[in-house]
Amino acid sequence: MAGGHCGSFAASAASSGEIVQLNVGGTRFSTSRQTLMWIPDSFFSSLLSGRISTLRDETGAIFIDRDPAAFAPILNFLRTKELDLRGVSINVLRHEAEFYGITPLVRRLLLCEELERSSCGSVLFHGYLPPPGIPSRKVTNTARSSVDARNGLNSMEGEARGNGTQPVLAGNGEDTIRLGVPVDPRKVLIVAGHHNWIVAAYAHFAVCYRIKESSGWQQVFTSPYLDWTIERVALNAKVVGGPHGDKDKMVAVASESSIILWSVQDGGSGSEIGVFSLGVPVDALFFIGNQLVATSHTGKVGVWNAVTQHWQVQDVVPITSYDTAGSFLLLGCNNGSIYYIDMQKFPLRMKDNDLLVTELYHDPSNDAVTALSVYLTPKTSVSGNWIEIAYGTSSGAVRVIVQHPETVGSGPQLFQTFTVHRSPVTKIMLSEKHLVSVCADNNHVRTWTVTRFRGMISTQPGSTPLASFKILSLEETESHGSYSSGNDIGPFGERDDQQVFIQKVVPITNKLFVRLSSTGKRICEIQAVDCTTISSFTVRECEGSSRMGSRPRRYLFTGHTNGSIQMWDLTTAMDMVNKTEDKDAGGPTEEELLKLLDQCDLSTSRCATPNISPATSVLQHSRLRESSSSLQLQHHETIHEAATYGATRPYRESPLLARARRTESFHSYRDFQTLNLNRSIERPVPENGHMGPAQTEVKGAAGECAMSERRSPGTEVRCGRESDGGLEVHRTAEGLSEPKKRSAEDENEHKVEFRKKGFEAGGFLGRKKVPYLASSPSTSDGGTDSPGTASPSPTKTTPSPRHKKSDSSGQEYSL
């Protein structure tokens, strides 16, 4: 019996001292079984116990397909419990130690990394706003019964009330097709600011914050829960002459074609002013003074005036860019023209209540104006004696036009032209000292130094080239409509100060690069203090102190996927970088870029920017989208006046149109009355390929075409194209009474004259009449119906998304 025990012990000892041959990445290592097994539940204990299948080479050694250079210090740690880096970076070694499950080594390496990283951030970290509470949803029995009535196709338009379901498209009255990409309700989609206020837009609600010197940042207002996902947001922290006094603030959000506007008091109470409809998806939402302005690339402008409480929708030429100057809204259009609207004199045409839209300038090459920037010089007065406009075109040209005091009667004159871009210009900025342009080739930036004499741009010695660099920024494959608005690269800052770009290299990252817009020089890089993914960002100046001599400070606000908002002091960062002259770094270095791309696979494509997709080994819930700068012009052709972005898209859209390819349907807009659905989620497509008799004829400004491409998990709506690049016309006659449609359009459409008005009361005179445009039919608040009167009270006709329900026959989502 004793001999048996001795034999068993000897066998056990021999087993623990067994020599193990390893082949790690082609390099052979010899060690003992005891060395590999002393850490429980590690890779080696599982391997040698048979829980993991082994692969042996020709010599019988266990093959492990890992880096041998990183394995050497790990094996040395298993032998001696001491760490010798042997030239391997701590980050790489920690990654390998995590793979092998060497827990004691991982803890040591994490502690080393914590020496340089703090949960309180760096010297630039300014503050942290925790995630707010999500407002409760109100679902009533009345709403549920309303759902049943709508599903029975028995309700009238405008009676919808919210039940919290996703919008749906009706097929043949029996089945439905769900639309929309699910969005994390905790993620900050957009951050916007004005003066000492910021607003954070989440998926279904918005939160306003205010800063005071004594108390810091405080949450002031939280909107009600919305059934629709927010895509645009605007904030006005200084409302003069508003309905509730000068201390009111206004915040607006947009989802698809609907806009909700709230009034917020200093005390934190808020009230809904109204719900408005643009009729087509909203691409931009902003304030000009007291006016709330919404624009769509399809060629619609909506304006709401805080004093008159009036909502006006105006048809214009399809819009490709915009900018504001004082009380003026300037529109760059796809026919090569620049128009302006005077918001201070809104509305001017009392005979039909149309906005006064005047053509300011027409591009000599008839190229679409894809980027626009207006600079009001200090010499500009009420008489409008000097103004400068820089714009970029679809062919890559950058032009500067100026209004001289001597040329008031003849309109602006072409001052300079630069043809340095081979891709469409997507952004442009004319400031006091620099001209900055960005094109679609991986956000390629060209900058010039602007020479001025007495505040006015000068030709002696003229604008001189300054820098050329790129702001590489990849986007998600199936991103929400708010992504382009919440992740705009800039440039940010006042035009008489240094401006900055914010570079977010990959969509799933916790790091941003802040760079000078003039030279591309890196000012700083910021990393989330809690290591969460940055989902949105913006740069604003806030007046933290009211003391005499204090200056506003510039802050970078970052929204995160966990709902928090983090703040960074860019004023300090710029002061620090100005003191050090030895830092010449710009964007991420090659090593930094490769590190950022560790979690991504770049797919091959013919695009100017490679598509980005998640590595199969680290696949996340969020899919990645091709870069916004991914479509390059094949050959430069004139963009005809009739063409629209929703039709041919021969080049990459401006940032204003970045979401046009994945926009939702154009609802019931009379010029876009159907969708050509290629596939469905909830029901199979019949053999004939038609979804039902709801398909109708689609019209666009370029002629008849299918709806612009829509990307969603369940449906795709794409614009038909012929093999030669032209439009493929999709026509159906089912479910449509053509004579009735024609007569309705004839009643609603009438010609609009564009009065020859000067910019700034005589500064600019329009040269031509605008092509035939139609004003949207409307009625006045008073209830008198006439084709030329103002639109009715928006709260009477347009239901709020808070009460909007999933309907299968309503105008908002009907086919």
UniProtKB/Swiss-Prot annotation:
Can you say where the WD repeats lie in this chain?
225-272, 277-314, 316-351, 420-458, 538-578
Specify where the region named Disordered lies, as residue ranges. Answer: 707-815
Which residue intervals are annotated with compositional bias (Basic and acidic residues) in the record? 707-759
**Amino acid composition bias (Low complexity), ranges on this chain:** 774-800
In terms of PROSITE patterns, this protein maps to: BTB (PS50097), WD_REPEATS_1 (PS00678)
Q: Where in the cell is it found?
A: Cell membrane
Keyword annotations for this protein?
A: Cell membrane, Membrane, Phosphoprotein, Repeat, WD repeat
What is known about the tissue distribution of this protein? Brain (at protein level). Expressed in the liver kidney, and heart.
The family database entries (Pfam families) matched by this protein are listed as: BTB_2
Q: Which is a GO BP term held by this UniProt record? A: protein homooligomerization
Q: Name one GO cellular component term.
A: plasma membrane
- Sequence positions bearing Phosphoserine: S605, S665, S712, S793
All residue ranges annotated as the BTB domain in the record: 18-87
Q: Which CDD domains match?
A: BTB_POZ_SHKBP1
Q: Which domain of life is it from?
A: Eukaryota
**Keyword Lipid biosynthesis listed:** no
Q: Region Interaction with HCN3: start and end of each range? A: 513-815
Similarity comment text for this entry: Belongs to the KCTD3 family.
* Reported function: Accessory subunit of potassium/sodium hyperpolarization-activated cyclic nucleotide-gated channel 3 (HCN3) up-regulating its cell-surface expression and current density without affecting its voltage dependence and kinetics.
Subunit structure and binding partners? Interacts with HCN3.
UniProt protein name: BTB/POZ domain-containing protein KCTD3
- Taxonomic placement: Eukaryota, Metazoa, Chordata, Craniata, Vertebrata
